Amino acid sequence: MSERKLFTSESVSEGHPDKIADQISDAILDAILAKDPEAHVAAETCVYTGSVHVFGEISTTAYVDINRVVRDTIAEIGYTEAEYGFSAESVGVHPSLVEQSPDIAQGVNEALEAREGQSDDFNVIGAGDQGLMFGFAIDETPELMPLPISLSHQLVRRLAALRKSGEISYLRPDAKSQVTVEYDEHDKPVRVDTVVISTQHDPEVSNDQIRQDMIEQVIKAVIPAHYLDEKTRFLINPTGRFVIGGPQGDSGLTGRKIIVDTYGGYARHGGGAFSGKDATKVDRSASYAARYIAKNLVAAGLASKAEVQLAYAIGVAQPVSVRVDTFGTSTVSESILEAAVRQVFDLRPAGIIKMLDLKRPIYKQTAAYGHMGRTDIDLPWEHLDKVSPLTEAVAALSEGA
């Protein structure tokens, strides 16, 4: 009998408490970068019933109306009714932002390499912290993402679209999805085993109505029919009721959905969150660079699955390590791939910032529905413009091996 395995990933909607916090943090970051592209920002947000606290460290010449940014973001998500227990115009906003530590700033503003006299513009900026970051790509989907997280994101995006268009009028902003995919003995996805959708709703609607709408208008609209069969389980609002939600039901905090933000647990994670951080924070920028590398390696046909690890020391520009793992799927040795990556990509913080143009206010749009594999927005780390340079570098290195 062939061995089959299950893998599960989840996503959450923009109205989930943790995602509200992420979006507020990134909205503040974008508002500052729009006026001061050189700003250093680390903005954290906590939300709960009737209150938003914004705290962290910022170095900027710009003035931003934090109160207005917070309220506008909450309204865009859909929390505009008092009965939700959390609404844009009545919520209390409590900012507490201070200047970045000078001890950290001296290493970011002048990297170790620059202090040692290595005259290169890209040696000026040091990494904002030590740490390790991962990027991943796999040929399971057109966007080169694992299928479970791809489907999970699509489900909650579809829910939000139906809510905002008014097509399903009883929907409220908070929601979660979870998809279990069955893989065959060759690690290829063959079917969807279980779909879980929990969606906040108005009190009057029946569970039968919710179930019917979720299956017909969400699940079947998103998941290709060949993945669904008579054994696929649909678990819709399994508790039986989800009226109280959002920050009224649970507190939310920036950076608590790092697996949702990346690969749904299918690949490793270095532990650093993204939202509210400018690109000198390698937790964010190097994770984007690692995805960029992995996606271009797979798109180039150099591997069918690739995981890239980058690691940094605070105040040092060059990464302390670069690793490529293709899980036995590469067409050449991983040492050649690593050498090609070092040739093609400048992985110093300033190099990443220039390569991906990361001083722009592009971050709020990433704060819900995933930072990787997005097909609905244009993100530079999803571009495939390094396929040819990588292919050429690998060919040259292979000849010289």
From Swiss-Prot:
L-methionine binds at E57, Q100, D250, K281. Its EC number is 2.5.1.6. ATP binds at H16, D174, A175, K176, R241, F242, D250, R256, K257, A273, K277. Mg(2+) binds at D18. Signal peptide: none annotated. It comes from the Bacteria. GO terms for biological process: one-carbon metabolic process; S-adenosylmethionine biosynthetic process. K(+) binds at E44. Residues 100-110 are annotated as: Flexible loop. Keywords: ATP-binding, Cytoplasm, Magnesium, Metal-binding, Nucleotide-binding, One-carbon metabolism, Potassium, Transferase. PROSITE patterns: ADOMET_SYNTHASE_1, ADOMET_SYNTHASE_2. The keyword Lipid biosynthesis does not apply. CDD domains: S-AdoMet_synt. Binds 2 divalent ions per subunit. Its cofactor is Mg(2+); K(+). It catalyses: L-methionine + ATP + H2O = S-adenosyl-L-methionine + phosphate + diphosphate. Pathway: Amino-acid biosynthesis; S-adenosyl-L-methionine biosynthesis; S-adenosyl-L-methionine from L-methionine: step 1/1. GO terms for molecular function: ATP binding; magnesium ion binding; methionine adenosyltransferase activity. One of its GO terms (cellular component) is cytoplasm. Its main location: cytoplasm. Catalyzes the formation of S-adenosylmethionine (AdoMet) from methionine and ATP. The overall synthetic reaction is composed of two sequential steps, AdoMet formation and the subsequent tripolyphosphate hydrolysis which occurs prior to release of AdoMet from the enzyme. PANTHER family: S-ADENOSYLMETHIONINE SYNTHETASE (PTHR11964). Belongs to the AdoMet synthase family. Homotetramer; dimer of dimers. This is S-adenosylmethionine synthase. It comes from Streptococcus equi subsp. zooepidemicus (strain H70). The gene is metK.
